[in-house]
């Protein structure tokens, strides 16, 4: 694979591309990566590449030098990628997709960004590595290159490890252990010590499911959606029915019954619940049973609610926040917004127009 990186600071990439796995892949000819200076295509005697934007502070990369730099390295099979927080979030699936390209051009932003006309003219796709702003796009380019290189045959010593690593099946990886069997009183789980591969695989899958559900509910929701037509365990099936259709009844363990009853009654504009039961309106007629457990550890539940239009969607989110609930991230496709109640139970909120 050939990769060209367009940046104002091409030397920024020298050390990372000489080191470790990427460095070895380049030496072996599996990767051909060149970093190029956009200033070479600057305007006038002083090679100007930036200017003040209209009606805005800071400096912006000009369209002409950027377009010239891209066209200088572009060929018929090239894919031009701009690293931007506005782009599609980088995932294992996207990394694998990029690894199939024969020539990638990574455009790194600097200062306040790049003149929009250059992006409209030359860029095929924008990719983000997260919802935050970096000092330059070079860091993001290195992250994407490292992620996609794992899927190029020969780059890793054992290609099978790339397929089995964490995130490849949509779930987080479970814990790993090595010797000694006991460290500071903490023991390796017994199931790993007897060589029963079927039992170990089952244990790893369950730990992976539990860890993803607890730590990354957004990933867990997407995992359930993506596996809709695949065989799943009974536990996953029960949860998926809750996510996709709404089950007839679900138990929410709560710390303070009065607080949760008041919260959900106001959220769904219900009359006071009968016997701690809440009947959620809609096609599925879900019933929520509130069960007070005090300070004991709760069994966290994932639920789904699809609203009829965007106005209802944003009204629901605003009401949730106003009543003291927590708004969390959207899923990686921007289709689902996660919210948490006081006790940590997660709702995946979407609207029909977003699907």
From Swiss-Prot:
GO cellular component terms, A-Z: cytosol
Sorted UniProt keywords: Cytoplasm, Methyltransferase, S-adenosyl-L-methionine, Transferase, tRNA processing
Keyword S-adenosyl-L-methionine: yes
Enzyme class: transferase
A GO molecular-function annotation: tRNA (guanine(37)-N1)-methyltransferase activity
Residues given in the record as S-adenosyl-L-methionine binding sites: 109, 129-134
EC numbers: 2.1.1.228
Subcellular location: Cytoplasm
Family annotation (CDD domains): TrmD-like
Gene3D superfamilies recorded: 3.40.1280.10, tRNA(m1g37)methyltransferase, domain 2
Catalytic reaction equation(s): guanosine(37) in tRNA + S-adenosyl-L-methionine = N(1)-methylguanosine(37) in tRNA + S-adenosyl-L-homocysteine + H(+)
GO terms classed as biological process: tRNA N1-guanine methylation
Record's keyword annotation contains Glycosyltransferase: no
Similarity comment text for this entry: Belongs to the RNA methyltransferase TrmD family.
Subunit organization: Homodimer.
Function description: Specifically methylates guanosine-37 in various tRNAs.
PANTHER family: TRNA (GUANINE-N(1)-)-METHYLTRANSFERASE
Protein known as: tRNA (guanine-N(1)-)-methyltransferase
Native species: Chlamydia abortus (strain DSM 27085 / S26/3) (Chlamydophila abortus)
Protein encoded by which gene: trmD
């Amino acid at each position: 694979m050939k990769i060209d990186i367009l940046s104002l600071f091409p030397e920024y990439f020298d050390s990372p591309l000489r080191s470790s796995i990427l460095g070895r892949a380049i030496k072996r000819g599996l990767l051909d990566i060149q970093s190029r200076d956009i200033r070479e295509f600057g305007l006038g005697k002083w090679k100007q590449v930036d200017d003040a934007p209209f009606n805005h502070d800071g400096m912006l990369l000009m369209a002409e030098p950027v377009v010239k730099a891209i066209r200088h390295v572009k060929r018929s099979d090239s894919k031009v990628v701009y690293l931007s927080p506005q782009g599609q979030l980088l995932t294992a699936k996207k990394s694998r997709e990029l690894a199939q390209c024969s020539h990638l051009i990574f455009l790194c932003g600097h200062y306040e960004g790049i003149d929009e006309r250059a992006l409209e003219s030359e860029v095929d796709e924008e990719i983000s590595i997260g919802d935050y702003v970096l000092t330059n796009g070079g860091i993001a380019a290195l992250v994407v290159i490292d992620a996609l290189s794992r899927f190029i045959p020969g780059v890793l010593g054992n290609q099978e490890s790339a397929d089995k690593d964490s995130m490849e099946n949509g779930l987080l990886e479970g814990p790993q252990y090595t010797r000694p069997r006991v460290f500071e009183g903490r023991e390796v789980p017994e199931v790993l010590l007897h060589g029963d591969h079927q039992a170990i695989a089952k244990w790893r899958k369950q730990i992976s499911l539990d860890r993803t559900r607890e730590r990354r509910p957004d990933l867990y929701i997407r995992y359930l959606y993506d596996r809709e037509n695949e065989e799943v365990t009974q536990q996953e099936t029960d949860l998926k029915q809750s996510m996709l259709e709404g089950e007839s009844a679900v138990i929410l363990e709560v710390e303070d019954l009065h607080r949760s009853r008041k919260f959900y009654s106001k959220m769904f504009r219900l009359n006071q619940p009968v016997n701690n039961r809440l009947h959620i309106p809609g096609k599925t007629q879900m019933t929520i049973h509130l069960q007070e457990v005090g300070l004991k550890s709760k069994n966290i539940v994932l639920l789904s609610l699809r609203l009829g239009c965007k106005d209802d969607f944003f009204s629901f989110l605003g009401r949730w926040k106003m009543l003291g609930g927590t708004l969390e991230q959207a899923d990686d496709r921007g289709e689902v917004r996660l919210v948490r109640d006081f006790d940590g139970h997660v709702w995946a909120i979407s609207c029909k127009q977003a699907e």
